[in-house]
From Swiss-Prot:
Top EC group: transferase
PROSITE patterns, A to Z: RHODANESE_3 (PS50206)
Protein name, as recorded: Thiosulfate sulfurtransferase GlpE
Any one Gene Ontology BP term: glycerol metabolic process
Keyword tRNA processing: no
Organism: Pseudomonas syringae pv. tomato (strain ATCC BAA-871 / DC3000)
EC number in record: 2.8.1.1
Catalytic residues identified in the record: C64 (cysteine persulfide intermediate)
One Gene Ontology term of the molecular function aspect: thiosulfate-cyanide sulfurtransferase activity
Primary location: cytoplasm
InterPro entries membership: GlpE_sulfurtransferase, Rhodanese-like_dom, Rhodanese-like_dom_sf, Thiosulf_sulfurTrfase
Catalytic activity as recorded in UniProt: thiosulfate + hydrogen cyanide = thiocyanate + sulfite + 2 H(+); thiosulfate + [thioredoxin]-dithiol = [thioredoxin]-disulfide + hydrogen sulfide + sulfite + 2 H(+)
Cited function: Transferase that catalyzes the transfer of sulfur from thiosulfate to thiophilic acceptors such as cyanide or dithiols. May function in a CysM-independent thiosulfate assimilation pathway by catalyzing the conversion of thiosulfate to sulfite, which can then be used for L-cysteine biosynthesis.
Family indicated by similarity: Belongs to the GlpE family.
């Protein structure tokens, strides 16, 4: 894959169930308040370590607030060598309305 794919929350949930890595690019306070279980917070401070330790061929799902910033982050990650990258349309807000029981705090 040379570009990322935009997907709905339902497809992101299916990928998550299959072992995809989920990263959340919202600010730290929003992530602490509520996020997708097992997702990792990714920001300018953690991205270098994340890339260095990642399996570049494992599916990677990127989520933000509403599905806009995640597209830029997904494109960047494709440029860093990730081969199977997805951006969640509607972001965390759409995820939360689709799967209200599939959120975590802390």
């Amino acid at each position: 894959m040379t570009e990322f794919k935009r997907i709905p929350p339902e497809q992101a949930q299916a990928l998550r169930a299959q072992g995809a890595v989920l990263v959340d690019v919202r600010d730290a306070q929003a992530f602490q308040s509520n996020h997708i279980p097992d997702s990792q917070h990714l920001d300018n401070h953690s991205i270098a370590d994340f890339i260095a330790n990642a399996d570049l061929d494992k599916p990677l799902v990127v989520v933000c607030y509403h599905g806009n910033s995640s597209q830029s982050a997904a494109a960047y990650l494709v440029g860093q060598g990730f081969s199977d990258v997805y951006s969640v349309d509607g972001g965390f807000e759409r995820w939360r309305s689709t799967f209200p029981e599939e959120t975590a705090q802390g």
